[in-house]
Amino acid sequence: MTAVPKKISPQDGFFWKTKTLEEMSQAEWESLCDGCARCCLEKLEDEDSGRIYFTHVGCRLLDGDACACHDYANRSERVPDCVRLTPENVRTLSWLPPSCGYRLVAEGRDLYWWHPLISGDPNTVHDAGVSVRGRVEATETEVSVEDLEDHIVSWPALLPRRAKLKKRPG
């Protein structure tokens, strides 16, 4: 007797729709990162309101053109205040950008068309205008903490119009 063929679900292959954050393998977890590097921008917190302000100043390890860390494996040792994202903290980090794959999945939402897991192309995050490519004005080693206020920008906390589209613009 032959086995009854398994019915293919439209969810097959979309692990972020079927697994909890805690159930994901390390490779699956890492692949939720869309490569935008917005989380690698320096941020300021208003001590009175708790509001977070992004700057266009990158971490000293950020390659602003590649939108990647120069030393990802050792980032916590080299930058002690680098926040490692975990299934626990992505649910509470209010400064994660609205486009962040970790944030979207933690909130039970789907990934956007430009996310590499959807598009199959790591460049769509740049095509959609979501990444920091071309927008990092300096690194933290070039700007004093006292001067960070002069570098506050709003775009990292916003989703670009073309990124909101349901599918890749043609």
Curated annotation (Swiss-Prot):
Pfam families: CxxCxxCC (PF03692). InterPro entries: Puta_zinc/iron-chelating_dom, UCP006173. PANTHER family: UPF0260 PROTEIN YCGN (PTHR37421:SF1). Belongs to the UPF0260 family. This is UPF0260 protein RPB_3505. It comes from Rhodopseudomonas palustris (strain HaA2).
